[in-house]
Amino acid sequence: MANLSGLSNRSRTTLASLRRFGFQTTQQAKPTESSKTPIDASVAENWSIRPELLSLFQETLQTELGAQVRIRPRPRILALSHGRNTNTVSADGFDFHFGVRAQVNPVAAPIRDLHDAFNPDGLLESLTAAFDTSPYPIRAVVLTYPGNPLGQCCSAEALRRCAKFCHDRELHLICDEVYALSYFGAADSEATPFQSIVSFDLNAMGCDLSRVHVVWSMSKDFGCSGLRLGCVISQANPELILGLRVPTSTEVSSLSTLCSTALLTSATLPDIIELNVKRLLLSYKAVIATLECHGVEYIPATAGLCVFARLAPEAKTPDDEIGFQHRLRDSGLLRASSISYNSMVKGSSDKIRPNNVRQKKMEPTLKILGASLQEALSQLTGPLNKERLAALHDHSEGRLVDANLGEAAAYTIDLLHQVEQLLEPSSLVLADHFLGYLNTKCLCAAVEFHIPDLLVEGPKSVSQLAQLSGARADRLGQVLRLLRNNGIFQYDTENATYSNNPTSSMLRSDHWTQWHNWVDLYGNEFYDMARGIPASLKQGTTRTPAQINFNTDQCMFDYFTAQGWLPRLHRTLGGGATAQAPGILADYPWEDFGDGPFLDIGGGEGALIALILRRHTRTKAALLDTPRVIEHARTLFLSPDGKLSRYGDLTMMVSADGQERTEAEWRTLAGRTGWEIRTIRKLRGAWPSDETSYINYIKPLILAHELEIPHVLSVIDTKDEWFYRIHPERMVPSLKDQDPETKAEVIVFESTACLQYLADRFDDGTWTGRNAAERGSVLSWTAYQTAALGLHENCLRQWDILEKRLARDGQEYIALKDRPTIADLSYFPFSMPWMFQFLGVDIKDWPSIERWSQRMLARPAVQAVMEMGPQIGH
């Protein structure tokens, strides 16, 4: 036993109290850090508004901390006598601080019903029993509300009766109101609202005001436990206030004083309090939704930071509870055990009434999702807003999206889109698709009236924008309202003004991506051309949708040239390539090249090369394109005096005619320039030339062999200018025929159109359908391949859909069960076995497709075309 003779009686009492709580005088071993990062739910810490408070405190300390800061503390100290009564459930921390610091003996007044902790009758019954049976003289009642962990508020009647109880027995009533501003139950009409004891007219009740006190601190409502600053409110006991204030005047730091003063006098204090309540409610909803989803019983709360729940219903003893606590800790979760609260020691947890937990799990799941999304939204528009804008929405030239955040954002967006598809009513899904045209036309109107350009100098009202643009104010307001609801433009409700956001800024006429050209061209002429799609589907129609819309037989290249639209088309396509370059740079490990050179074939104006060279300054690169493109690109890389511009170290430019498709041709062309190609990287969306350069033109060739149609196969240079007359983008396949009646020339391009034309001319219905039902199925699946699924980028999704279709009983082919049709030819090239290999997947994961592809490959016409296809043009 240590020698205590040198200690005062007070110190001896304090030491004995500490030992009672397990503290030892021996030196403790240095604590070891856990290798895990646990979720710590064991401490009542309020983190909901910590980012806002941290910002406020940092600014305060930078501007206000100096040598002359005065300290006027109002400490939260309870210097009680030798006994006090406390209502429970209460945290074990109360026992420690009252016993060690104030050296009083707490007497618990157990709560009989945890669901109705502050029932006036039950509360008074418990207080009376504790007072009458206490082995110590009672001097005060400490009432904590809203309480930890129940999160319930005292009713007005309970507070009045408690005050009267104390007055009749000459006791002090100490109301712990540290959660006073954390009441979030206002939306619940049946919830008991928070009322402070100081809001009552206690004199009218005949109570002694000098014996009623309120304790409050910064620790809970504002999550500032580290400031160690609080206050005691005693309206009629100046002697008590003096006794508390003077002895503790040196115990409050200047930092705590500065931060607390800044917060409590801030003009934003009401907003911070409101935000705190809002976020606490969201967190509470998320917690109880999870509990309900798993059938866990809990006590509904309306205030504070805790939810009291029966996580281990099988636990009957303290040892059971401790064992469960250890299992949670091993799993990475720390939480306060029920034995940390006085009531649990007395078995009060057995009186938790089961909630009516719904058997249906969808509602709590949606609550969890909603609360999580609301919290994410608050973070993304609040403390994370600056990082979000910098990482994902900085579209200045050469600026790249953060690769990791971009990937995470894309994954999240995909999930949200899937959730939207699952939850959105079908009528709204159709409305969204149907009204998409309206959204596009509103966007076109904003570009046409130069609204993004007019907002460059700052926010403007609708009337100001209307005056500057020449638009009608009322209709312009309708257009802008629709656009800002879709994330384009930013609106200040207080000042009723619009301003550019990162999205609308990209529509400025001087923006390097030239998005305004895309909107203008595709949102007007291309959308107008789309109106011809229904008419183009009719059998016997030879005009394309664009020709139908413009009522012309000219190819679109000739028509665009005649209308003077071709320069704008080139600017649009060039701007699009430039806009895509940052994404390509972010997606691929260009640093693997080190200081070696690479060749960008068909690189246009060199946007990709420019970005790569700026990011990786030791890398060298070459641009391979037509002479006219090279001459234009040269001006972008070289300054007038011949020095390299800011775009980087471009060591060589070469040009070549013709359309290079195979790796062998790439190596030949590079060899002529003195380069040696050591590595060829395939970009996302690019396809292996030797196996897939013929992927489209084999479709009509197979049908021609199946129908035994006499034909002449011509191999042409698609880069030649004359080919614009055949195809507006100089692509293959295209076919030329003669009308059997008028002898007029017939030109058809695009593989699906070629299939349909050949079938219309030479098929008896075998490949297109012999009756209405068959024709409908063939037409639908053929159109779906090109219109809905796309060509390259959606292969995996396409295969999943085909697998589901072909897995049906007796469904040996796509459109019809018993025979192939042009629908099978439409899908077949993209479902060849080597396509699966190219994308790094196993065709055996799609067994129905594998069986179907083998049936198609076994057809003589398919074998004949597949044998000749790779050699065409090589």
UniProtKB/Swiss-Prot annotation:
Amino-acid positions noted as binding S-adenosyl-L-methionine in the UniProt annotation, renumbered to this chain: D625
Region annotation (O-methyltransferase ataM) ranges: 340-668
GO biological process, any: secondary metabolite biosynthetic process
EC number assigned by the record: 2.6.1.-, 2.1.1.-, 2.5.1.18
Catalytic activity: RX + glutathione = an S-substituted glutathione + a halide anion + H(+)
Chain intervals for the UniProt region annotation (Aminotransferase ataI): 1-339
Cross-referenced InterPro entries: Aminotransferase_I/II_large, COMT-like, Glutathione-S-Trfase_C-like, Glutathione-S-Trfase_C_sf, Glutathione_S-Trfase_N, O_MeTrfase_dom, Plant_O-MeTrfase_dimerisation, PyrdxlP-dep_Trfase
Ranges where the record places region Disordered: 20-39
Region annotation (Glutathione S-transferase ataG) ranges: 669-874
Molecular function per GO: glutathione transferase activity; O-methyltransferase activity; protein dimerization activity; pyridoxal phosphate binding
Compositionally biased spans, kind Polar residues: 23-37
Cofactor(s) for this UniProt protein: pyridoxal 5'-phosphate
Domain GST C-terminal: from-to ranges: 739-874
Enzyme class name: transferase
Domain GST N-terminal: 699-766
UniProt pathway annotation: Mycotoxin biosynthesis
Deletion phenotype: Impairs the production of acetylaranotin and accumulates chemically stable intermediates or shunt products such as 2-imino-3-phenyl-propionic acid amide.
Keywords: Methyltransferase, Multifunctional enzyme, S-adenosyl-L-methionine, Transferase
PANTHER family linked: O-METHYLTRANSFERASE CICE, PUTATIVE (AFU_ORTHOLOGUE AFUA_4G14580)-RELATED
Similarity comment text for this entry: In the N-terminal section; belongs to the class-I pyridoxal-phosphate-dependent aminotransferase family.
Functional description taken from the UniProt entry: Trimodular acetylaranotin synthesis protein; part of the gene cluster that mediates the biosynthesis of acetylaranotin, a member of the epipolythiodioxopiperazine (ETP) class of toxins characterized by a disulfide-bridged cyclic dipeptide. The first step of acetylaranotin biosynthesis is performed by the NRPS ataP which produces diketopiperazine cyclo-L-Phe-L-Phe via the condensation of 2 phenylalanines (L-Phe). The ataC domain of ataTC then catalyzes the formation of bishydroxylation of cyclo-L-Phe-L-Phe.
Protein name per UniProt: Trimodular acetylaranotin synthesis protein ataIMG
